[in-house]
Amino acid sequence: VNVSGWGNDSATSRFQPDSGYQTEYTKFVKQVTNKPVVGVGRLTSPDMMVSLIKQGVLDFIGAARPSIADPFLPNKIQQQRIEEIRECIGCNVCVSCDNLGVPIRCTQNPTMGEEWRRGWHPEKIAAAKTPQSVLVVGAGPAGLECALQLANRGYEVILSEASKQLGGRVISESNLKGLAIWRRVSDYRIYQLQQMDNVNIYLDSALDVQQVLELGIEHVFVATGALWRKDGIGRSSRTPILGLDQVAIYTPDDIMSGASLGPGPIVIYDDEQGYLGSVVADHLSDLGHDVIFVTSASIVSPFTELTLEQKQVQRGLVAQGVGIY
């Protein structure tokens, strides 16, 4: 017997940030049956799992998404390797893949969906044939993961980051409304790197081509990220939109960097149709700005239908008083 629909089982951290959020309306089940009860609800913390079992709320823990983020979750709990657990962030990109009928991917687990590779194991990393130094330029999520796996292979890793902190875009994006838990993407990797003796991290260290060449390191990995365009080229327009130079244009990067927007209404034109346009609209509205949301789609953020969020996204903007066109 299932007492919850899939959309509620698999709520995202954007709308259900608390681990074990279903407990209040599922704890009655143990009182009406002597059958073993399995419960879910974004249970990512071993402490929470143990607590629910000891309290008699559940007999078993269902951890589908947490096990996608870290397939070795049960082993790590059993072996007391708690600090090595790569916790699910509840973004539902895995659910979106399932809804699309394509191989499942995971923001936290880059090896998800690669299990078909014969003779390959995500935690058995082949040692470097020749120990040598490698340079990773950029310490956002991709750069951190690259540095971590190179270090696992035994290379001497130099990680260079232009800014004053590690994490890249995920640091600023996780400051937007509803996305705080996404910071786990950087937190996990930063912690693992800090435990390694063969990793040297340099902050506030922008490098140009000449400086990279002068280091004399044979293998260089560039993970410097990307920025949003300001010219209007996107899903609906393959050429720049005329007249944008006559108004103040901001990108999500500007908003995440804390740009001062000044007085007057803010128009958000969402031609990307992913999740971020609605997040920015919700965030700015929450800060007290008068927000108008314009989209080329028939609904707000159609991608979020695949992550089971769309109705909550659109309903939330309406409740905030955001004009939608």
Q: PLM features: what roles do these ranges have?
A:
Residues 1-137, 141, 145-157, 165, ...:
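Flavin-dependent oxidoreductase catalytic cores
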Residues 31-32, 54, 152, 195, ...:
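Residues at the C-terminal ends
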Residues 169-218, 304-325:
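N-terminal Rossmann-like dinucleotide/flavin-binding domain of flavoprotein oxidoreductases
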Residues 221:
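N-terminal Rossmann-like NAD(P) cofactor-binding module of classical short-chain dehydrogenase/reductase
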Residues 128-160, 166, 202-216, 224-305:
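Rossmann-like dinucleotide/flavin-binding elements
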Residues 17-20, 56, 78-81, 175-179, ...:
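Short, hinge-like loop/turn segments at secondary-structure boundaries
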Residues 13-18, 121-126, 131-132, 172-184, ...:
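Short, contiguous acidic/charged loop-to-helix segments that flank catalytic cores in large enzymes
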Residues 28, 51-52, 76, 192, ...:
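Well-formed, non-transmembrane alpha-helical positions, independent of function
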